[in-house]
Curated annotation (Swiss-Prot):
Residues 9-55 form the F-box domain. CDD domains: F-box_AtAFR-like. Kelch repeats lie at residues 94-140, 141-187, 226-272. This is Putative F-box/kelch-repeat protein At4g34170. The keyword Repeat applies. Keywords: Kelch repeat, Repeat. Pfam families: F-box, Kelch_FKB95. The lineage of its organism: Eukaryota, Viridiplantae, Streptophyta, Embryophyta, Tracheophyta. It comes from Arabidopsis thaliana (Mouse-ear cress).
Amino acid sequence: MDDGEELPVKTMLMLHDDLILNCLARVSRSNHPTLSLVCKRFHSLLASVELYQTRTLLGRTERCFYRQYSSRKILVQILSPNSTSAGIAVVGPNIDAIGGGIKSNTLSSVMVMDSRSHTWREAPSMRVPRMFPSVCTLDGKIYVMGGCDNLDSTNWMEVFDTKTQTWEFLQIPSEEIFGGSAYESVRYEGTVYVWSEKKDVTYKLHEGRWSAADMSANGWGWPGSSYCVIENVLYSCFVHKIRWYDPKERVWTPLKGLPSLPCNGHVKLADYGEKMVILWEKYVDVDEKKMIW
């Protein structure tokens, strides 16, 4: 070979898809947005279910945290076709955006994102349009309640079976809980707990039947609170303080070792692999931009 002769250039794009997937599967998902801009082929492979399957075989799966956010000025933009007033449910790899609204139009539609490929599909719509509904999941079913003004004892809650892909209304536990459109719900102790803001009562669903819950009202069901269950311990955030519920003593106990959270802005608790994630808003007065930490 002459000294002036150039060696043939071989790039990763010359490889077969299976080999490229094997390489991409070893790269952290935090780098996927940048890699997807390299070429259309990378973009397609990074959004494929085959990539997730390859990562699973290689033992390279990662936990990812998703935050519903309306701003378009973010690095990784995965926007729901519904608005931020939709209820969010997670069942397996799927993230469901339920209801919501566009301006004054309340929606009954349900959109499902496959977190493995970040692709959206439409699911069967609810029977009643709902905005800001309370959503809870249990045993592959999604419980949706409240979120509209024309509720009655027959339509206050509906349940979506993710296996049969069907909706059905659930009978109200008692006339005592019915009233208003605002409810809080949480999956706790293997069942669904529901609290009515207007009536200030709590019920739980057990083996298809409702019963009054003996949970202390002090700390449960306050508007604006955020709830999170980790290893069957229920945590609540209210007035920017985090507490946990002691079912034996029926009292809420302050969580020690955590400094007070900022007073100006919402706080959100979430389960991240049996660890609690705390999100709060930070307001910067200089340019009036809202930041999430």
